[in-house]
Amino acid sequence: MGHVVVKYKVTIDQPEDGSPDYEGIANTISSMEEVQACEIKPLAFGMMFIEVHAVLGEGEGIVDGFESRVREIDENVGQIEALEMGRL
C-alpha cells in the first residue's frame, strides 16, 4: 500500500470572545504523527490559516478520518480544504 501527500488549508473561526488560538491549534496539529509540516499563514483582513502537509496511507476513509481528527482539536476549527494531493 502506498502513501499520499496532502497539503491542507485549515481555517479557524473567530470566537465570540477574543481571538482564535492559532498557535495552540497549530501545535496540536503538528504533534499528529502524519503531519510533516505545519505553518500559520496570513489569509486576509488580519485573519490567518494553518497550512498542513500530511503523509497519509492510501485506503478508503483515511483522508476523511484525518480531517475529522483535525476538526476535533478545537471547536473553532472551521473549514479544512485539500489544496494539493499526490502519491509518494
Regions found by a protein language model. Name each.
Residues M1-L88:
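Long, contiguous binding/interaction regions
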